[in-house]
A protein has these predicted regions:
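Cofactor-binding loops of NAD(P)H-dependent oxidoreductases
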Residues: 11, 129-131
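N-terminal, positively charged regions that mediate nucleic acid binding
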Residues: 134
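Conserved G1/Walker A P-loop phosphate-binding module
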Residues: 1-46, 50-61, 66, 141-144
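Conserved C-terminal guanine-recognition region of P-loop GTPase G domains, centered on the G4
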Residues: 25-27, 50-128, 138, 144-147
Length: 149
């Protein structure tokens, strides 16, 4: 969603190091940190995400980006939330935005079903985007800027 050029690939855990990018819209800008994905037991040191969890402590908000092609998006969201909570319960008190990404890869009906599942689970609006086609990104950025201000 920013001008950063992180590696993009069709497999999990493409991000191996935090990537910072700047989002600019009109006269506003903000820094977005793309942190490597968390796996179950990351708070215990498993996977790459653990060593980057400290970066999340400094963030104003958390954007949960979930791959819409995941079979169980609810489990994916809950795994991330659980790991953040196990690392530091205060992190889960931050502003949250939930995003389903890669929406160019599956049909609209399946996206709608998964979006409803996550909205029921999180009680939050879920944004659907494709960072490849750009679909939905502008709406997401508008929401991020509203929360920031």
């Amino acid at each position: 969603i920013s001008a950063a050029k992180p590696k993009v690939a069709d497999y999990p855990f493409t991000t191996l190091d935090p990537k910072l990018g700047v989002v600019r819209k009109d006269d506003q800008e903000l820094v977005v940190a793309d942190i490597p994905g968390l796996i179950e037991d990351a708070h215990k040191g498993d996977g790459l995400g653990f060593k980057f969890l400290k970066h999340i402590e400094r963030c104003h908000s958390i954007i949960h980006v979930i791959d819409v092609t995941d079979e169980d998006v609810k489990k994916s969201y809950n795994t991330i939330t659980s790991e953040l909570n196990n690392y530091d319960g205060n992190i889960t008190k931050k502003n949250k935005i939930v995003v389903l990404n890669k929406c160019d890869l599956i049909d609209k009906e399946e996206i709608k079903i998964k979006k409803n599942i996550l909205e029921n689970e999180t009680q939050l609006q879920v944004y659907t985007i494709s960072t490849i086609t750009g679909e939905g990104v502008s709406n997401l950025i508008n929401h991020i800027l509203i929360i920031k201000n």
